Amino acid sequence: MTFRHCVAVDLGASSGRVMLARYDSKHRTLTLREIHRFVNCLQKTDGFDTWDIDSLEKDIRLGLKKVCNEGILIDSIGIDTWGVDYVLLDKQGQRVGLPVSYRDNRTTGIMPQALVQIGKSEIYRRSGIQFLPFNTIYQLRALTKQQPELTAQVAHALLMPDYFSYRLTGEMNWEYTNATTTQLVNINTDDWDDTLLAWTGAKKSWFGRPSHPGNVIGDWICPQGNRIPVVAVASHDTASAVIASPLANKHSAYLSSGTWSLMGFESKMPYTTDEALAANITNEGGAEGRYRVLKNIMGLWLLQRVLKERRITDLPALIAQTEALPACRFLINPNDDRFINPDDMRAEIQAACRETDQPVPVSDAELARCIFDSLALLYADILHEQANLRGEKFTQLHIVGGGCQNSLLNQLCADACGIRVMAGPVEASTLGNIGIQLMTLDELNNVDDFRQVVSANYDLTTYIPNPDSEIARHVAQFQPKRQTKELCA
């Protein structure tokens, strides 16, 4: 067959998309077309920050039906989402309550309990995953301790992409790359860790053994009656984004830039040394047995909140105003846990600057400048940290995802990190999702083969570092700003 049509459902924490890919196996051309885009946002339910799971499912089905109504024969479907959040089901397979967001404050104070009762080094030895207060391990502990009546109804727990695949196929699956984000998968066995799971109070019977990307979960029957296979792709959106990152060699790092920024490198072995633990490095699962050695950074969430609060709709105009301002007048630590979900992001940023005896950003452009400069400096700090961890410097950084469209931030990143930055592709998560589908359909050999297809079909923008820039001169001075209470504290 010359042409393949694959559908990627790509859900982020702020929006979702149904995308159609067309692959010409003869000429190895790959094109994407957006079929349906929709909003994803938090809602308050009984005092919890929850996801409107029914609305998301409705939009997914609407997007799939739009493709089918065009008369296109779909070869496969894949779903990727953000990590750590889950949906509870009863023994009839019906949903129990609404899924609570990782940004909800129910996990406050839970992680310190685990550090005392199990031990930080023991948790890290077992999971190899970074300590974030909203990891699934702490969410489940909060659930079982705070809502025992709800817990009693539960027979299964599915992570977000697995839930939507279940709703399409009727078959349950626990995909490996996303499962590793829970901090509950044993890094040596790739199965759920009995000790960590027992501590949460959740039953092991809620979960099936994690499966690696590439298996067919089941079929979705389209309105025309065709059975379309639903593939378990690398269902954590960052895992998919990394698959589509055209990494040149082992000296290339990646930065998946969106609501979250995830910065790291690929490795055939995990890094679980005391040094890695001290740096709060995570070893999330990737495709083909590779590890995504990385660190979570709060990312463009700060900007997204400011845009929403200030009702700013013209982002290019704001960036142009921001670029005209002097660099590094206002600096914060974007990974300070005060920025996870404040009532007022603008006020929180201003308070952080005030508390560190800095000028206080007032205008929208000043707030954006503060965010961009601070992110670029944090990227540089973490890249240096990771280079020391592996004992080799990086020579190139690939920025993928929606954030790679921000040319100002890309240049600031190149200047601060002191290495060449390659920006693109924008739709990295969607492309990585499609890549696993094409491998499952035997159209591509492996991830490296797929990256060659990406490189041939998608243009990248190069940013050369300027060592004389203002931000480059501030790199060494930024470290004290990170001595605030970070996400892992």
UniProtKB/Swiss-Prot annotation:
Cofactor needs: Mg(2+)
Binding residue positions for ATP: A13, S14, S15, G16, R17, T259, Q304, G402
Enzyme Commission number(s) from the entry: 2.7.1.5
The protein's annotated pathway: Carbohydrate degradation; L-rhamnose degradation; glycerone phosphate from L-rhamnose: step 2/3
One GO CC annotation: cytosol
Residue positions of the active site: D237 (proton acceptor)
Any one Gene Ontology BP term: rhamnose catabolic process
Keywords: ATP-binding, Disulfide bond, Kinase, Nucleotide-binding, Rhamnose metabolism, Transferase
Family matches, as SUPFAM superfamilies: Actin-like ATPase domain
Disulfide bonds: C68-C222, C353-C370, C413-C417
Binding-site residues, substrate: G83, H236, D237, T238, N296
Enzyme class: transferase
Cross-referenced InterPro entries: ATPase_NBD, FGGY_C, FGGY_N, Rhamnulokinase
Main function: Involved in the catabolism of L-rhamnose (6-deoxy-L-mannose). Catalyzes the transfer of the gamma-phosphate group from ATP to the 1-hydroxyl group of L-rhamnulose to yield L-rhamnulose 1-phosphate.
Family that this chain belongs to: Belongs to the rhamnulokinase family.
Protein name: Rhamnulokinase
